[in-house]
Structures are given as C-alpha cells and as structure tokens.
C-alpha cells in the first residue's frame, strides 16, 4: 500500500491539481471528478479510472467506503492523502473524501450507431460550463443519444461542467467537431430543428416525431449563420414577460421534452 500523501508539493498532487486547467487536461489526457453519486455513475459507465485520492477522515457514513471498495476492484492507483491535501484537490466547499482521475472520453460522430429515430443535441459553440453540464444532465434524462459540440467551445471536462452534469457526462457520448459540413452530412434523414426566440413555429406545433437533431445556439450570439443554413425548421419559445431571453439550458430542456412527449408511444 502506498504511504499517505501529506504534502501538496508531492508530484502526483501537483499534476492532479493542474487538471483544473484545460491545457493540462488535454496534455495529460485525463480529468478529475468527485461527488459520491457522480463517481458511482462513472464506475457504472465503465469509464477508465487512473488514480483515486481518498481521505478516510473526511468520510461520512458508509457510502464513501463502499465506493472506495469499488475503485479497488479497478486498475486505478489508490492513494491515501491527508485532509489538507484532499481539500486542495477538491472543488467542493465540503469534500466527501474522494477525488478520482479518469481518462478523457473521446467520441466521434462515426462511432454513433444511429437508426434515425434518435434525439441528438447539437450545441453551436457553447461557452458556459455550467450551462453545458445542465444540458448534458437534461439530455441524459430525456433519452438523447448524444450531445454534439461545435468547436471552439467550452471544455466538456471543465470541473464546473463535470459537476453540473451530475454524472450524465459519463452516460452520454459527447462529440466535439469543427467540421460543420461533415456533421450535418451525417445527420441526413434527421429533422434539424433550431431554437429561436423570435421566429419559427411555436414549439408545441413543431413535428418532434422520430429522429430530431435539436440545435441550440451560443449563449451570447445565438446560432451562427453557417449552422443556421442547415436548419430545416425553427421552434420558438414565446415570452409574455419582460425578460429578453431564456437561458439556453432552460430552453433546451423544454424542447427536449417536446421530443419525449411526441415519442412516448414509439
């Protein structure tokens, strides 16, 4: 068993703490995650665990020890750390005693086995990590088959995205691509429905049956011209109040569940 790590200057701790930066996640090919439920979901998904840091002094109840036992059944390296070191690794105000490091999960559009009846979420260069995490969580709940991010975009493995996804990041294929033309060529046969507050059919009147690629715009600029050119119909969410717009994650959730309702009997 490895000795307890008590210094934040330990090389493993130094490298793990760098994972809050995108460039280091990409260089190392890995990312950090925490939260007991989220980590259970990661293990259930088969995500490859590289390292686990734990501090028994911060465990509360039986769930953390049970989770640690699950990690011991993997090929991950397991390290006991002091409370101060665990707190330095954690993004949470009240750490639950476990932080795990996983391999980055990379998927391509070619890896999707699609029948044409799926719901796909296409995000046009999203920039807010919290919004992306919420969209991932909602897409997972709605039964979407994948979330596709047109780049440049926020990193899906940003700590805020990982946390706000509540583990759904491990359940859904997340595809990143800059090739808009190739992307929409792969979506031939899908209805390409764009969300727009100002024009198009009221969302309840749109045809959400069968295969739909729901396209959501950038938080500040909406849908870009190059992406808009592929949209075959528009869904609007009319607003009766004084707000200028809906949060993209909220709007996306409403539209995802329009697809769910339309396909309940399939």
Short names for language-model regions:
Residues 44, 70-73, 79, 84, ...:
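RNA substrate-binding interface of SAM-dependent RNA methyltransferases
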Residues 138-142, 153-169, 225-266:
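Structured adenosyl-cofactor binding patch, chiefly the S-adenosyl-L-methionine
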Residues 22, 113-121, 230-239:
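Glycine/charged-rich beta-loop-alpha catalytic/anionic-binding loops adjacent to active sites
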Residues 57, 151-154, 220:
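Short, ordered loop/turn segments at secondary-structure junctions
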Residues 1-93, 189:
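N-terminal positively charged helical leader segments and presequences
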Residues 35, 128-134, 246-251:
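Amphipathic alpha-helical repeat scaffolds
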Residues 193-243, 247:
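Active-site/ligand-binding-proximal alpha/beta "capping" segment
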């Amino acid at each position: 068993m490895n000795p307890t790590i008590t210094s934040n200057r330990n090389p493993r701790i130094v490298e793990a703490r760098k994972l809050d930066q995108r460039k280091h996640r990409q260089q190392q090919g890995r990312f950090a995650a925490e939260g007991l439920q989220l980590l259970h979901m990661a293990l259930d998904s088969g995500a490859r665990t590289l390292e686990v840091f734990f501090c028994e002094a911060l465990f509360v109840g039986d769930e953390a020890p049970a989770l640690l036992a699950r990690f011991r059944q993997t090929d991950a390296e397991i390290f006991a750390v002091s409370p101060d070191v665990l707190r330095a690794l954690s993004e949470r105000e009240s750490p639950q005693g476990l932080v795990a490091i996983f391999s980055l999960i990379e998927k391509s559009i070619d890896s999707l086995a699609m029948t044409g009846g799926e719901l796909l979420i296409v995000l046009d260069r999203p920039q807010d990590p919290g919004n992306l995490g919420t969209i991932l969580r909602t897409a997972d709940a709605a039964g979407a088959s994948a979330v596709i991010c047109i780049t440049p975009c926020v990193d899906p493995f940003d700590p805020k995205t990982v946390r706000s996804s509540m583990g759904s990041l491990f359940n859904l294929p997340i595809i990143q691509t800059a090739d808009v033309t190739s992307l929409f060529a792969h979506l031939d046969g899908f209805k390409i429905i764009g969300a727009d507050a100002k024009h198009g059919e009221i969302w309840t009147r749109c045809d959400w049956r069968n295969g739909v690629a729901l396209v959501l715009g950038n938080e500040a600029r909406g849908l870009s011209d190059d992406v808009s050119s592929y949209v075959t119909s528009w869904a609007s969410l009319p607003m009766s109040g004084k707000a200028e717009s809906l949060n993209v994650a909220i709007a996306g959730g409403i539209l995802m569940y329009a697809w769910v309702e339309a396909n309940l009997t399939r």
